[in-house]
């Protein structure tokens, strides 16, 4: 399996993540994906061919293997890593949408040169507002996926230990047969390692949610004690709802003032223009 594309996407999200989120990404790609690609796939590469039962009955080996190993460990871990990494793409799409809006605002303000647009693409987006909710939801989904997969793994393989010998009575085996698992010690070591890495990721996800909530509460308390100035600058200020509403009100007041000046200079224009002016004022 090629993990390069997934790594490229998550690396873009990593630029806008918290410090805990960057540690989580390192654990994902160093301690889980690298181990899965380099070592685990080779250890489980011959699991079906090396699963031997002491019988010559056709089909007995395959049936017993499917009974004791319904899902391969490697495929289960691969599916887990893909689903755990998918919520981070929500943050990537949200950041891309926010940067698109910033570029549109710059073009409307007359700053649509390539230098300013490239600066929007390079600068780090702060986790606040709707992006904060998107980021928290993505972390919560990561946490849920990790917990669900650990529970499913426990249901499939209780005890997390790879046994050396299993006894199979499934049809078409003629009687109870002994089946031998290849490399049980190596598989047990890698299983414990991958589950420990998954547990570390769960702890990091919980810590990141707590960190985001504490930082949001601290930011809100700071805003209450020190109200922000209306003359703020920067891309984030241009995108704030207060700034947009102030700009709209300013444009409406300028249009209303211009219309009243025209009426004062031209008193004979009639009641039609005055009525239009009153309607604009009511708006």
Swiss-Prot record:
SMART domains registered for this protein in UniProt: CNX, Connexin_CCC
GO BP: cell-cell signaling; epididymis development; purine ribonucleotide transport
Xref: InterPro entries: Connexin (IPR000500), Connexin32 (IPR002267), Connexin_CCC (IPR019570), Connexin_CS (IPR017990), Connexin_N (IPR013092), Connexin_N_sf (IPR038359)
GO molecular function, one term: gap junction channel activity
Origin superkingdom: Eukaryota
Topological domain spans for side Extracellular: 46-75, 154-191
Membrane topology field: Multi-pass membrane protein
Protein location: Cell membrane; Cell junction, Gap junction
Cellular component annotations (GO), alphabetically ordered: connexin complex; cytoplasm; gap junction; lateral plasma membrane; plasma membrane; protein-containing complex
Keywords, ordered alphabetically: Cell junction, Cell membrane, Gap junction, Membrane, Phosphoprotein, Transmembrane, Transmembrane helix
Cytoplasmic-side segments: 1-22, 96-130, 215-283
Transmembrane annotation, as ranges: 23-45, 76-95, 131-153, 192-214
Family: Belongs to the connexin family. Beta-type (group I) subfamily.
Known partners and oligomeric status: A connexon is composed of a hexamer of connexins. Interacts with CNST.
Protein name: Gap junction beta-1 protein
Gene assigned in the entry: Gjb1
